[in-house]
Regions:
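Secretory-pathway luminal glycosyltransferase catalytic domains
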Residues: 41-147
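A general structural motif
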Residues: 1-3, 33, 136-138
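Short helix-loop boundary/capping segments at the starts of domains
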Residues: 27-34, 57
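Histidine-anchored nucleotide/phosphate-binding helix
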Residues: 18-30
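A structural signal for short, well-ordered beta-strand segments and their strand-loop junctions
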Residues: 5-6, 35-40, 140-142
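Nucleotide-activated donor-dependent transferases that construct or modify glycoconjugates
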Residues: 1-12
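A short, glycine/small-residue-rich beta-strand->loop->alpha-helix junction that serves as a flexible
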Residues: 10-20
Length: 147
């Protein structure tokens, strides 16, 4: 069986990094028709592995676990999209790196959006909060401070 996984998902960066890493893993697997897996939701991770805590993650059903530790680890070769690596990605490996570009998963965008749909218990208070702005213009601003 051709399989790839991301054993360090949740250890390599924070929550935003996890989103890219999960989506890229799925995108690489889909392109090459590989099976794939991610760490189980109850795995303790120092960086607060929390994809299953707030998102439906419907595409990950039956896809939790680890690839064997004897699988080679394939890290990113650059911080930019590596088309050559993407097109020739080997099977039976552990994926690593940040992979912070949608180019790894744009071809399965709808599946990723479905996985990253918020759980009802997250959406309910958000909808309640947003009712106070009904009919008005709302702008959300995210400021990222670097060290």
């Amino acid at each position: 069986m051709k399989m790839i996984g991301y054993n360090r998902l949740g250890d390599n960066g924070r929550f935003g990094n996890q989103l890219f890493q999960y989506a890229s893993l799925r995108g690489i697997a889909a392109k090459h028709k590989y099976d794939w897996c991610v760490p189980p939701p109850d795995t303790y991770k120092a960086a607060n592995y929390g994809l299953f805590d707030c998102f439906k993650m419907s595409g990950a059903e039956g896809k939790v676990g680890y690839v064997p530790h004897n699988f080679e680890t394939v890290d990113e070769t650059t911080f930019a999209f590596d088309k050559e690596q993407f097109d020739s990605f080997p099977d039976n490996v552990n994926v690593d790196g940040y992979r912070q570009t949608e180019k790894y998963f744009k071809h399965i965008e709808n599946k990723i959006r479905k996985d990253f749909a918020f759980l009802p218990e997250i959406m309910k208070p958000c909808r309640k909060f947003m009712k106070q702005f009904a009919g008005g213009r709302v702008v959300f601003l995210h400021v990222r401070r670097e060290r």
